[in-house]
Amino acid sequence: LKRIITLGLAIGLLTSTVASADTFLRYGEVEGWKVFADQDKKTCLIEAVDDAENVVQMGLTEDRGVGYVGVFTKAETDIKRGEKEAVAILLGDNIYVGEATGMKGNITKGYSGGYVLSDDPQFADDIAKQKVMVVFPEKEFAFTVDLTGTYKAMEMARKCNEEQLG
């Protein structure tokens, strides 16, 4: 059993699908994922939106020491901003347990969701290489996230991140 390291940092996730935010510049797109450069934080993130308008975002914190994965929906949820709950994430044969932080109100109107933080390189590797992520929140029903294309999107984000430092 592996553990997700959670720090409870406030991350400015989901700013409308990010494209409309002033500080985010579209960097590129690959296999259904958009890559954005955050001009303020000098980091990059990847984002995918499914047919039901659910949004998945992944990136690095401003200090680049920790990665995040956020999942947001327009569906009705009981998620409260800042509320933390236990979560387990299955990626291939690996289960990661930790804490998810809820977001509502400070993100795009009509969306709620949460994010996890991790500094485990295996977690990032599994996200890049697996096709599906199964999330088991403490209070809600389990759900799956399609990870198709994450490997190439994460590669593009790495290049984007390197360019932000230059």
Report each predicted region and the residues it spans:
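Bacterial N-terminal signal peptides that target proteins for export
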Residues: L1-L7
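Bacterial N-terminal signal peptides
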Residues: G8-S16
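A generic "folded-domain core" signal
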Residues: A21-G166
